[in-house]
Amino acid sequence: MAERTHACGKVTVEAVGQTVQLKGWVQKRRDLGGLIFIDLRDRTGIVQVVFNPETSKEALEVAETIRSEYVLHVEGTVVERGEGAINDNMATGRIEVQATKVNVLNAAKTTPIIIADDTDASEDVRLKYRYLDLRRPVMFNTFKMRHDVTKTIRNFLDTEEFLEVETPILTKSTPEGARDYLVPSRVHDGEFYALPQSPQLFKQLLMVGGFERYYQVARCFRDEDLRADRQPEFTQIDIEASFLTQDEILDMMERMMTKVMKDAKGVEVSAPFPRMKYADAMARYGSDKPDTCFEMELTDLSEFAADCGFKVFTSAVESGGQVKAINAKGAASKYSRKDIDALTEFVKVYGAKGLAWLKVEEDGLKGPIAKFFGEEDANVLMSTLEATAGDLLLFVADKKSVVADSLGALRLRLGKELELIDESKFNFLWVTDWPLLEYDEDADRYFAAHHPFTMPFREDVELLETAPEKARAQAYDLVLNGYELGGGSLRIYERDVQEKMFKALGFSQEEAQEQFGFLLEAFEYGTPPHGGIALGLDRLVMLLAGRTNLRDTIAFPKTASASCLLTEAPSPVAEAQLEELNLKLSLKEEK
């Protein structure tokens, strides 16, 4: 078999007159009265191959048996197309290959999905036949971008003198965070490893070990409920460094991301990226990962509402809640009563009891609550919301958390429905100064907002023992277009501070020692100040490639129920395998 001389998508007018050897898949076959045209495809693109009896009867006879997705080896001569046959939409659209020989390397059954960017296959079918789905050019281009992003990051970190170090996949289960995937030990009866949710502890121990600058393209595993932008196994760019301040870490990440955007996407973004404190993000956008590609900020009306004529507003403020509003500029005519009812049901999903609304017309406010506002209140309301005729005003009165969640989600929905989001924009943002701890009323305890190893502000360390809810974290999240790309922090590196953190989280001294004794001891041997960040590679590629689902950036992903339709994992195992592990199954009975 002769060696391939050209990739299909790389045959251009410069090759006219040359004999070429091509190998690839049949994208399309057309029989035009004695001539057969085949579009031959490989990962670089498509080239048209012509089978003509005047060139080779033998090749034509073989071509008559060929169908879509057959794998071919074609030998032929490159010729220019006639004027009427030129296709400038293809890189190879000015030439075609006159076939002299063809060899079928492998036949193919009729495929269950159309191998094209605009395939009509359902996602389940695409996942079941993932190896066929991956043949689509849009999928290859996505993974080419993933490769380019990873290569750029590796090259950048190498120039910054970071070492790539692999950390264990079989590790210790810890109680914080999401559920672990557990792996039973055959050697140690009744004991289990856990697959890592992140390399957090090991990368900190590498700092204790004096490596100073570490990174890893790390596989991570979390047994949590899935959604469009979550997978049970995922990849993060994990970075840690000693002796750097928060500003130095953020500056380095900005330089890295601007290079990624330029090299992998061809887009120039400016640095430094804007910074916003967590409290401001929640107040202005109702989100800790605000999409700043469009305006429409939340406006706090609590002071006005405390003394207005609308009892729903006043009672919310009196009970310690708040009232906030969104002004959807020019949207009054675009939303009917039925549409607003749909928005009301939408905010109820986020805990809101309802959605109050007003439309601004030339002669004043109109809507079901307009009667509660006199002329003076109406003027204050319009002035505060900068409202003009044609605007739609939307209000939620409730607990602060409910107001933020519901209006934050509503803002994003309106942004999409009103086409306010410029898809060509890439707006990076740092969200800083996070709360260190969050209180869970159901569990009646504090949880770490990021993780238990985040350094509080120095002046807040004592608050861990007196008022944990007031302690601030030296933490930072990187946001792109409303998606959290990753998060990081400066880390605790002193035993006494780490013990205070564990105590605030409800750990007894014995529990802390049992779970994290190795880390606490390490902190007694001269641990340097350190910090870092973990960036979600899958999510970054999803955004840069213009995909809407993380599954499109992972070669062999899981479904929303964490199953693989291709291999049918997870699956039962043989009884003998369980016996080797000294395990017995006790399955719940189906009701």
UniProtKB/Swiss-Prot annotation:
UniProt-listed Gene3D superfamilies: Bira Bifunctional Protein, Domain 2, GAD-like domain, Nucleic acid-binding proteins
Keyword Transport (UniProt): no
MF-aspect GO terms: aspartate-tRNA ligase activity; aspartate-tRNA(Asn) ligase activity; ATP binding; catalytic activity, acting on a protein; nucleic acid binding; transferase activity
Binding site for ATP: R222, D223, E224, Q231, E484, G536, L537, D538, R539
Domain of life from the UniProt record: Bacteria
GO cellular component, one term: cytoplasm
EC assignment: 6.1.1.23
Any single Pfam family the record assigns to this protein: tRNA_anti-codon
Compartment(s) where it occurs, according to its Swiss-Prot or TrEMBL record: Cytoplasm
Binding annotation for L-aspartate: E176, R222, H450, R491
Swiss-Prot/TrEMBL keywords: Aminoacyl-tRNA synthetase, ATP-binding, Cytoplasm, Ligase, Nucleotide-binding, Protein biosynthesis
Record flagged with keyword Isomerase: no
Catalytic activity from the UniProt record: tRNA(Asx) + L-aspartate + ATP = L-aspartyl-tRNA(Asx) + AMP + diphosphate
GO BP annotation list: aspartyl-tRNA aminoacylation
Site (Important for tRNA non-discrimination): G84
Spans annotated as Aspartate: 200-203
Family under the similarity heading: Belongs to the class-II aminoacyl-tRNA synthetase family. Type 1 subfamily.
Subunit structure, interactors included: Homodimer.
Role description: Aspartyl-tRNA synthetase with relaxed tRNA specificity since it is able to aspartylate not only its cognate tRNA(Asp) but also tRNA(Asn). Reaction proceeds in two steps: L-aspartate is first activated by ATP to form Asp-AMP and then transferred to the acceptor end of tRNA(Asp/Asn).
The protein's name: Aspartate--tRNA(Asp/Asn) ligase
Native species: Bacillus cereus (strain ATCC 14579 / DSM 31 / CCUG 7414 / JCM 2152 / NBRC 15305 / NCIMB 9373 / NCTC 2599 / NRRL B-3711)
Organism taxonomic ancestry: Bacteria, Bacillati, Bacillota, Bacilli, Bacillales
